[in-house]
Curated annotation (Swiss-Prot):
Subcellular location: Nucleus; Mitochondrion
Species the sequence originates in: Saccharomyces cerevisiae (strain ATCC 204508 / S288c)
Sequence positions bearing Phosphoserine: 546
Compositionally biased residues, Polar residues: 491-504, 513-529
A molecular function (GO) term: DNA binding
CDD domains: Tau138_eWH (cd16169)
Protein name, entry field: Transcription factor tau 138 kDa subunit
Subunit structure: Component of the TFIIIC complex composed of TFC1, TFC3, TFC4, TFC6, TFC7 and TFC8. The subunits are organized in two globular domains, tauA and tauB, connected by a proteolysis-sensitive and flexible linker. Interacts with TFC1, TFC4 and TFC6.
Amino acid sequence: MVLTIYPDELVQIVSDKIASNKGKITLNQLWDISGKYFDLSDKKVKQFVLSCVILKKDIEVYCDGAITTKNVTDIIGDANHSYSVGITEDSLWTLLTGYTKKESTIGNSAFELLLEVAKSGEKGINTMDLAQVTGQDPRSVTGRIKKINHLLTSSQLIYKGHVVKQLKLKKFSHDGVDSNPYINIRDHLATIVEVVKRSKNGIRQIIDLKRELKFDKEKRLSKAFIAAIAWLDEKEYLKKVLVVSPKNPAIKIRCVKYVKDIPDSKGSPSFEYDSNSADEDSVSDSKAAFEDEDLVEGLDNFNATDLLQNQGLVMEEKEDAVKNEVLLNRFYPLQNQTYDIADKSGLKGISTMDVVNRITGKEFQRAFTKSSEYYLESVDKQKENTGGYRLFRIYDFEGKKKFFRLFTAQNFQKLTNAEDEISVPKGFDELGKSRTDLKTLNEDNFVALNNTVRFTTDSDGQDIFFWHGELKIPPNSKKTPNKNKRKRQVKNSTNASVAGNISNPKRIKLEQHVSTAQEPKSAEDSPSSNGGTVVKGKVVNFGGFSARSLRSLQRQRAILKVMNTIGGVAYLREQFYESVSKYMGSTTTLDKKTVRGDVDLMVESEKLGARTEPVSGRKIIFLPTVGEDAIQRYILKEKDSKKATFTDVIHDTEIYFFDQTEKNRFHRGKKSVERIRKFQNRQKNAKIKASDDAISKKSTSVNVSDGKIKRRDKKVSAGRTTVVVENTKEDKTVYHAGTKDGVQALIRAVVVTKSIKNEIMWDKITKLFPNNSLDNLKKKWTARRVRMGHSGWRAYVDKWKKMLVLAIKSEKISLRDVEELDLIKLLDIWTSFDEKEIKRPLFLYKNYEENRKKFTLVRDDTLTHSGNDLAMSSMIQREISSLKKTYTRKISASTKDLSKSQSDDYIRTVIRSILIESPSTTRNEIEALKNVGNESIDNVIMDMAKEKQIYLHGSKLECTDTLPDILENRGNYKDFGVAFQYRCKVNELLEAGNAIVINQEPSDISSWVLIDLISGELLNMDVIPMVRNVRPLTYTSRRFEIRTLTPPLIIYANSQTKLNTARKSAVKVPLGKPFSRLWVNGSGSIRPNIWKQVVTMVVNEIIFHPGITLSRLQSRCREVLSLHEISEICKWLLERQVLITTDFDGYWVNHNWYSIYEST
């Protein structure tokens, strides 16, 4: 079977294939690709395919490696040359990286790796083979892979005895992306207790339990699990115990023992993570003491949805950012302005970016940075002869943004208490008298900041240096190209003076820049070329502290304050980091590595003391004034305050293990015994082997080298063994109700069993949820059933029935599987159906006009949400949706010409009406459209074909199932007849003086009549008293397996004279020419069933959308009826007194709307 696709889809597929094959494929490969979608037995089809491909400007055809412009027919018919199809280099880069070669930053070597990974396709390639294929140094491959890591998916595996990564390209990899949803440990507390309870002897190892429940996948889950175990032990739901191995008493494992059930409630509000919870490792684990000090983040109690539903919320508009106004002060130098701004900023200082924004603007950032190098100082590089107006720049950062902060000398002294490190001279040196006026000095010494030194060769062959734009060159002189500026080399010794001249201007310029300093500025003190980033400076001592930046100085002072507050002694752990962060007012915890670096600097400057405990390896810090006794008291206090765990020891008991490795470790004997046993087994095997060899030598003569060859072959085969990667994509057979997938599977399983067996088969469903109890599943289902409501339930059932019919038709499942209720196969059908719906692609052209030609653009603003979407929502969501909806109406009259749309609607109506009577017809047989232009008919037919309303088979038109399905589903008029009969029966009973007792939930049809009579005050309703046992009830829905009313209701007539309503007058059904309306046949007569179906559909839309307008009705029924047909139906209903008009030309149903067909 050949799957036909659009030409643009084929071009995209071919482009991707070329990109995944290093930018070029052969012509035969092109036929293999397109052969999946087109029948290439005909040469014209091949010509069409190749023409579509080469029409794309990025795709080129090569003949023997050279680009050719031959005709498509010549290329296909030429068998003497080798042809291939390729794409341009920029297109190759764009398809693989999303950027052109100039825009991308990954580099050529990394792109070469990317090409090989793309060529490997879905199979992928490991890093070892990747280095061999590309010929790159394996040591460099790792860094280059990091540059393209965002484009790849990787998984670790063992290959030839090495741990390598299997790499695949995300763009061409079709593996499902593993979802990593957030897991709230509160929801799993009851599961942990239940699993331990059902385990053997009610005891489980902590590590083994964590692996079974899959809490060992990431560090956060592992910490959360340990915190949960500690909380359950504290609340006495579980008990921590040590279990001794029966074979080796030296082996003890940490376990938990079941004590009692956890209360039946959603989560545990009082549960909090314990920062000092013990880990689950063995007793001798050296990491236990370190992990005890790690804090675990608290559980998330914040719910954004609940917050938004609170009353009294106030919406504040965000004020527009104030635009920076540049000073552009022409009267004072930049140095004076910079000093003034830095002086006004006080001890806080001001960043260089803020200064630039205020004085010159961002456009002159680089120029300002260069000019400020003359007067800005650092602590380790101070200038002279600057008077009392000195500016210091200090390295600082905010998050990842690094910059310099400017201070005046006086403010910096106050900030750092470093009067000794910063000297403030009394004044400037006296300047000598100048005989040249100021104007001449300015003209002689003016140099633009963006000017550069250029050079050329004069007529004598000498290099001439000049500022750009200042040298006048004669017209006949030949200027050396600039591109040789850096590549010119000194030829011989005669040009030695010229070489000296080349370097002299640079040296002169450098000497001018650093004439006031002893040595050139280091890279650490100067910003980068773009002025956006800076590098950390050296460690500078001021005020007794050693720091690299202002932030480091602030942290060190905060550390001293915290140490004084807590008593002068502390462990370097999470609690200490949080205390420092809290003191500094930081919303997040400071980086541990940064704080440790500050502590080391404080230890070097003797502001703190530090030592490391020899046993636990933990670091303790203290103030120099604290004595040894205080330190020992603190250590003993921390040990005594630590909660004792695993105090109970259990001997001679059997426990269940999920992990076989842990089971073998628990039952392992002493190592000496194991070694003796293995040695005895080796000796026994050697004797048996020797006897077997002797027997074989007697029976046959064997070459001596056979054994060696076999051993060598065994080694070679072992070396050639490839790693088999486990296929993770398998049909899921086990679920857990605590996960999102598990809840979805539970809902689907209930829908499947209820629709097939007409009852919920809990015995079948529980097999899919082995880790959940039946009561837990029922509670989960009850909550979901109440939330979805009856309409949501019907939506699920209808969807499942549709999928089941399609699966049986396509033979994906047999009737036997359905009858035997094989839930695994049935749920897999559902899952595969949803995946196909999601993956269905839609490709558009770049040109908007092409899209208008190829596609029918349908306005979907009125169909944003379907009925099922609203039905699947909760009551609160429905209410919020209604409150957010804005009801508007256009006041001004529309001036749009509706003649064309009316003509198209008439053509649609005629075609629908004809195809209902004769499902297949030709266009020439439509007599009703003889007076309509052929172009209009063709356009409408193509639109209807794209909307899947008709099929085109040559010149014949064939009706699809769309129209009959809509009429059958939305036009069920039989309920109206049943409702009218029910109304007659009720009238007879009540007119006879009888009452009606209702002890079951009324059906939909009977509720129409009863609500109508009650709202018209024609009935009275009372409660029948009954004695019943009062017991606590839980909230359940009336629609959910409980249909009995408690107590029963009784209804009786209020006034017998008003029960018999006047019968509706007969109104003529609108008719016309043959096939002019959907309910008119070829002879001009009415189609009764079609008429009742379209009327029912219109009435139902008005019932559920009160006040709906005619245009809105037409948009909701556009697949069946035209605007003219709907207006005739509404006019007929108005005359029948079924509808009532409202303001703004809307419609509303009358009180007895269900009696439409009373006399028809």
